[in-house]
Curated annotation (Swiss-Prot):
One of its GO terms (molecular function) is DNA binding. Keywords: Arsenical resistance, DNA-binding, Plasmid, Repressor, Transcription, Transcription regulation. Transcriptional repressor for the ars operon. ArsR is a trans-acting regulatory protein which controls its own expression. The repressive effect of ArsR is alleviated by oxyions of +III oxidation state of arsenic, antimony, and bismuth, as well as arsenate (As(V)). The gene is arsR. This is Arsenical resistance operon repressor. Residues 32-51 bind DNA. Signal peptide: none annotated. PROSITE patterns: HTH_ARSR_1 (PS00846), HTH_ARSR_2 (PS50987). Residues 1-92 form the HTH arsR-type domain. It holds the Pfam family HTH_5. GO terms for biological process: response to arsenic-containing substance.
């Protein structure tokens, strides 16, 4: 994952409501109406947040009759965590490996 891609995901995650939606979905699949009951915002606002989460692969969606069901995309969230771990280590993939320190 590139820095630009990771930055885009982190921007999506920087919204407190979206983080709370992910937390609610950590308990399992929920429909939009269940999510909406938890928040004090309108259905269009929820739709905006869900579109962002789905478009960025953090959440998956499926239709169940006339309901939209949402669940966490655990595989992609694990992938994001792996990429954040790379930034937090000094392994071979680290950008600092090509730097010569103390030669300014």
């Amino acid at each position: 994952m590139s820095y630009k891609e990771l930055s885009t995901i982190l921007k999506v995650l920087s919204d407190p409501s979206r983080l709370e939606i992910l937390d609610l979905l950590s308990c399992g699949e929920l429909c939009a109406c269940d999510l909406l009951e938890h928040f004090q915002f309108s259905q269009p606002t929820l739709s905006h947040h869900m579109k962002s989460l789905v478009d960025n692969e953090l959440v998956t969606t499926r239709k169940n009759g006339n309901k939209h069901m949402y669940q966490l995309n655990h595989e992609f969230l694990d992938y994001i965590n792996q990429n954040l771990d790379i930034i937090n280590t000094s392994d071979q993939g680290c950008a600092c490996k090509n730097m010569k320190s103390g030669e300014c």
